[in-house]
């Protein structure tokens, strides 16, 4: 089983304490808010719309709930000649990622990461760099890596019917060169986060602005509790 995923990598990029708690103390997470739930649901809807626009693919995630199995199945499907895959799963250096859409172009592949916002953020680019690092490292030849975001407000988009999706629903930004430039930095960050996860105890990092940037941490409630109360909860 992979030690890191795209999700945990981004959490660790935000805060080392965040990734540590997420790995070993999941039960301490704050309850999911209604706003967060709607955002996750909206992301799934937008993802389905992207698959509708890039028709003819096979959704690898439907094959199994085991990510280890999905890595093997992705490799098999590529070897069998499939040219469009959704949620293709790759592992390299004990890091696992799932690519939203991959499309074969000649002997190489174009990767598309779908975002449900109207702007591409710095965090989205870091996300892309990690995916490039893993997919390239796994041996798949990458021709281009694209980030995509919405041309229309998300709340409008998630109310659209599939048959009414406009051809220009998404705008695309190619970030292949950026991802290549960050290969060494990404590998160093992976190494750094693995070191953090090997620590014998929770990193001592105080709360601050980073708790809400770029995303709201899921452990703010835990970190704001008095230290004595935290110790009692962890060791009782």
Regions found by a protein language model. Give the residues of each.
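Generic alpha-helix signal with a bias toward terminal, lower-confidence helices
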Residues: 16, 21-25, 31-33, 124-126, ...
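Metal-dependent nuclease catalytic cores that hydrolyze phosphodiester bonds in DNA/RNA
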Residues: 1-108, 231-236
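Well-ordered mid-protein domain cores that form the structural environment of catalytic cofactors
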Residues: 67-148, 152-156
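Sequence-level detector for tyrosine residue identity
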Residues: 18-20, 24-25, 40, 86, ...
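Metal-dependent nuclease catalytic regions and adjoining charged, substrate-binding loops involved
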Residues: 119-122, 134-220, 224-231
């Amino acid at each position: 089983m992979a030690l890191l995923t795209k999700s945990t990598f981004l959490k660790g990029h935000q805060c080392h304490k965040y990734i540590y708690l997420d790995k070993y103390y999941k039960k301490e997470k704050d309850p999911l808010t209604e706003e967060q739930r709607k955002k996750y649901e909206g992301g799934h809807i937008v993802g389905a719309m992207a698959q509708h626009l890039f028709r003819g693919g096979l959704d690898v995630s439907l094959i199994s709930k085991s990510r280890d199995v999905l890595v093997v199945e992705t490799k098999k499907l590529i070897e069998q000649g499939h040219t469009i895959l959704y949620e293709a799963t790759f592992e390299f250096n004990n890091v696992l990622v799932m690519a939203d859409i991959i499309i074969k172009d000649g002997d190489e592949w174009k990767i598309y990461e779908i975002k449900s916002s109207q702007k591409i953020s710095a965090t989205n680019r870091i996300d892309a760099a990690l995916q490039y690092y893993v997919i390239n490292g796994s041996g798949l030849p990458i021709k281009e890596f694209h980030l995509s975001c919405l041309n229309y407000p998300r709340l409008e988009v998630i109310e659209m019917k599939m048959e009414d999706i406009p051809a220009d629903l998404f705008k695309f930004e190619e970030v292949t060169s950026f991802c290549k430039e960050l290969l060494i930095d990404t590998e160093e960050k992976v190494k750094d986060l693995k070191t953090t996860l090997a620590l014998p105890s929770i990193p001592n990092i105080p709360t601050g602005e980073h708790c809400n940037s770029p995303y709201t941490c899921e452990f703010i409630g835990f970190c704001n509790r008095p230290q004595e109360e935290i110790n009692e909860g962890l060791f009782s």
